């Protein structure tokens, strides 16, 4: 069973995010990491990069494929999770604890609630 925590916002392209005080923490869902299997590399963006809703945020490579992760919002990247450059497999272990980037939110895109996302991936 795929883990879909309440209290997060989800996208149809399998990203999650949570906004606190105008800063969004962004990652990929448990469903996404389970489809990719063993993650071996994360190509993180640069702090200061500006992204719009739907832009490619970064790329994650697994033994199975390379997948783009899309920005769920418009804003500037304020922090990247450097730990993932050394240990990309941490995303497989805990996709909600191992966020990818933090962004200053200018505008949110369309999102799904946890309940709506659960229905999408059934």
Swiss-Prot record:
HAMAP family xref list: GcvH
Pfam family, one: GCV_H
Family (UniProt): Belongs to the GcvH family.
InterPro entries: Biotin_lipoyl, GCV_H, GCV_H/Fam206, GCV_H_sub, Single_hybrid_motif
Superkingdom, taxonomy of origin: Archaea
SUPFAM superfamilies: Single hybrid motif
Record PANTHER family: GLYCINE CLEAVAGE SYSTEM H PROTEIN (PTHR11715), GLYCINE CLEAVAGE SYSTEM H PROTEIN-RELATED (PTHR11715:SF3)
Keywords: Lipoyl
Keyword Zinc: no
Disulfide bonds, paired cysteine numbers: none
Residue numbers bearing the N6-lipoyllysine modification: 64
Keyword Ligase: no
General function of this protein: The glycine cleavage system catalyzes the degradation of glycine. The H protein shuttles the methylamine group of glycine from the P protein to the T protein.
Subunit structure: The glycine cleavage system is composed of four proteins: P, T, L and H.
A cellular component term, taken from the record's GO annotations: cytosol
Needed co-factor(s): (R)-lipoate
Taxonomic classification: Archaea, Methanobacteriati, Thermoplasmatota, Thermoplasmata, Thermoplasmatales
Any one of the GO BP annotations: glycine decarboxylation via glycine cleavage system
Co-factor: note: Binds 1 lipoyl cofactor covalently.
UniProt name for this protein: Probable glycine cleavage system H protein
All residue ranges annotated as the Lipoyl-binding domain in the record: 23-104
């Amino acid at each position: 069973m795929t883990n879909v925590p309440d209290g997060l916002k989800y996208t149809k392209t399998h990203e999650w995010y949570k906004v606190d005080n105008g800063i969004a923490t962004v990652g990929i869902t448990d469903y996404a990491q389970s489809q990719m299997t063993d993650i071996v590399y994360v190509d993180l963006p640069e702090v200061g990069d500006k992204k719009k809703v739907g832009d490619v945020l970064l790329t994650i490579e697994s033994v199975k494929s390379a997948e783009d992760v899309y920005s769920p919002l418009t804003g500037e990247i304020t922090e990247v999770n450097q730990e993932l450059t050394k240990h990309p497999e941490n995303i497989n272990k805990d996709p909600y604890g191992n966020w990818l980037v933090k962004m200053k939110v200018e505008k949110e895109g369309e999102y799904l609630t946890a309940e709506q996302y659960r229905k999408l991936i059934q």
